Each structure stands twice: as C-alpha cells, then as structure tokens.
Curated annotation (Swiss-Prot):
This is Ion-translocating oxidoreductase complex subunit E. It is found in: Cell inner membrane. InterPro entries: NqrDE/RnfAE, RnfE. GO terms for cellular component: plasma membrane. Its main location: membrane. It comes from Shewanella piezotolerans (strain WP3 / JCM 13877).
C-alpha cells in the first residue's frame, strides 16, 4: 500500500480522529444537533487542520524543539481567527449557531496532535494530504452524527442550510416526516453521547467482520531436533 493510500485509510477509517482516537469530543457532541452545524464545524476544522499542517511542515526546520508546541499553538490560533472572521463575515447565522465552539478549535487535540506527530516530521505535500484526510474523516463523523440526530429529533435534514450556503439553500431542507414536538433526547447532549457510542460500536462490528473474513495464516510448529550425545 502506497504512503498516500495508507494516509487516507488511517484518516478516514483505521485511525479516525472521532471514532478511534476520540479527540475533539466536546465540539463533536455539542454542535451536531443538525447536519448544517456539523458540516460547518467540520469544514472549519478541516481548513485549520490543512493550513496548520502546511505551515508547521514549512517551519519545522527553523523552530527549536524546546519551543515547538507554543509556536504550533500560535500558528493554529492565527488560522482559527482567520476562519472565524471569514465565517462571521459570510455566514453570520452559522457563526451564531457554532458560538464558542468555533474559537475552541484552537484547543482541538486533533489539530495539535497531527502538527506534532506528523507535520513536524514530514514534507509539505504529505502533511497537506494528511490534514485533508484527517479533517475529512472528522467531518464525516460530525455529519453522520448530526444527520441522525436531526432526523430523529425533528424529522428534517439540512434544516438551516441557508446559514451555511446562503439564501438559495433554503430549498435544500428535506422534511422526512412531520413531528408535532421535537424528540429532545436526540437533540440534547445525552442523545449525542448515545449516538456516538452507537457509531463506535458499528465501526467495531465492521472491523471484526472484516477481520473474521481474512484468511488465517497458520504458523508451522518448529520441528524438534533430537540431539544425541556422542562420547
């Protein structure tokens, strides 16, 4: 398997930041009440992750090891501020919905973890691809959790899409079924914990099924050699 296929496999499935590493759980559980919020936060996180990996890879040879973590945090904070200002200017409704969890991307362990573990030790191209795959894997988990909670909670999909994509996106809202009142368990944090647990369990079931279908290689027992003492 090539390096890039391995990076894609690691980010999207085997070492997924949300399902395996369980990083960034605070925003993951807090803002995934709707698919729109989940997609918005996922895209913002992915942009910061790609940008931080690129910049860290560029400066890795010029930053002393003793101060690398503060420098990485400053780079991430600058990128988060830029993304925050962009969303504030062009998607103000989404900016209000995400609230404090948008600037808290700075403290997301996924970003600082990839900067330290990968970007600081690899080329710009590989670091960019790693950031893309890790960010995409995290975004997919956010979207699946957000979509399931929104459907169960209020029977819709892409509700409030205009906050992310503009006025034209109002027509994207899909009414799955009509509900008189929202299913609060799905919309509140307890529902997020239950949904996340089910996603992790589903991934484990799939992994176990794939592993069970793999042909088992039987190791041959080492042959015993009889040593006869000769006088």
């Amino acid at each position: 398997m090539s390096d890039y296929k391995e990076l894609a496999w690691q980010g999207l499935w085997k070492n997924n930041p949300g399902l395996v590493q369980l990083l960034g759980l605070c925003p993951l559980l807090a803002v995934t009440a709707t698919l729109t919020n989940a997609l918005g936060l996922g895209l913002a996180t992915m942009l910061v992750l790609i940008g931080s990996n690129i910049l860290v890879s560029l400066v890795r040879d010029y930053v002393p090891k003793e101060i690398r973590i503060p420098v990485f945090v400053m780079i991430i904070a600058a990128l988060v501020t830029s993304v925050q200002l962009f969303i504030n200017a062009y998607a103000y409704g989404l900016y209000l919905s995400l609230g404090i969890f948008l600037p808290l991307i700075v403290t997301n362990c996924v970003i600082i973890g990839r900067a330290e573990a990968f970007a600081s030790r690899n080329s710009v191209v590989k670091s960019t691809f790693d950031g893309l795959m890790m960010g995409l894997g995290f975004t997919l988990v956010l979207c699946v959790l957000g979509a399931s909670r929104e459907i169960l909670g209020q029977g819709t999909l892409f509700y409030g899409a205009d906050q992310l994509l503009g006025e034209w996106a109002k027509g994207l809202t899909i009414q799955i079924w009509q509900v008189d009142t929202t299913f609060l368990l799905a919309m509140l944090p307890p529902g997020a914990f239950i949904g996340m647990g089910l996603l992790i369990a589903l991934k484990n079931v799939i992994d176990n099924y794939i592993e069970a279908r793999q042909p088992k290689v039987e190791l041959e027992a080492p042959a015993r050699v009889r040593i006869t003492k000769v006088n």
